[in-house]
């Protein structure tokens, strides 16, 4: 009985978390396509190519991998050398 209650609470929590963290889909495709078309005409405009605010290896990043240039973060930015 306890396990069933725990499972129900866990599923409800995950469903609520999904709705809270979901993106707003109103006018999503309308706003997405003109931006993508602009990036196709000018590849330099792509946000994926820009890494201006990234930190080099050995700097503190917490647990947010987006701060590191290498995208590997475990408290500090990790850079692998081949």
Curated annotation (Swiss-Prot):
Q: Which family does it belong to?
A: Belongs to the conotoxin O1 superfamily.
Task: Identify residues that carry 4-hydroxyproline.
Answer: 65
Role description: Delta-conotoxins bind to site 6 of voltage-gated sodium channels (Nav) and inhibit the inactivation process.
Please list which residues make up the signal peptide: 1-22
Q: What is known of its domains?
A: The presence of a 'disulfide through disulfide knot' structurally defines this protein as a knottin.
Instruction: Identify the domain of life.
Output: Eukaryota
Please identify the protein, giving its name as recorded.
Answer: Delta-conotoxin-like SmVIA
Q: Which InterPro entries match?
A: Conotoxin, Conotoxin_d-typ_CS, Conotoxin_omega-typ_CS
- Propeptide at 23-49
In which compartments does the protein localize? Answer: Secreted
This entry's Gene Ontology molecular function terms read: sodium channel inhibitor activity; toxin activity
**Might you report a single GO cellular component term?**
extracellular region
Identify the keywords attached in UniProt to this record, alphabetized.
Answer: Cleavage on pair of basic residues, Disulfide bond, Hydroxylation, Ion channel impairing toxin, Knottin, Neurotoxin, Presynaptic neurotoxin, Secreted, Signal, Toxin, Voltage-gated sodium channel impairing toxin
Q: In which tissues is it expressed?
A: Expressed by the venom duct.
């Amino acid at each position: 009985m306890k396990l069933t209650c725990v499972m129900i609470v866990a599923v409800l929590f995950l469903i609520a978390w999904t709705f809270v963290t979901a993106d707003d889909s109103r006018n999503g495709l309308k706003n997405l396509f003109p931006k993508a078309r602009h990036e196709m005409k000018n590849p330099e405009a792509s946000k994926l190519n820009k890494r201006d605010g990234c930190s080099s290896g050995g700097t503190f990043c917490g647990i947010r991998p987006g701060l590191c240039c290498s995208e590997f973060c475990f408290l500090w930015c990790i850079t692998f050398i081949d």
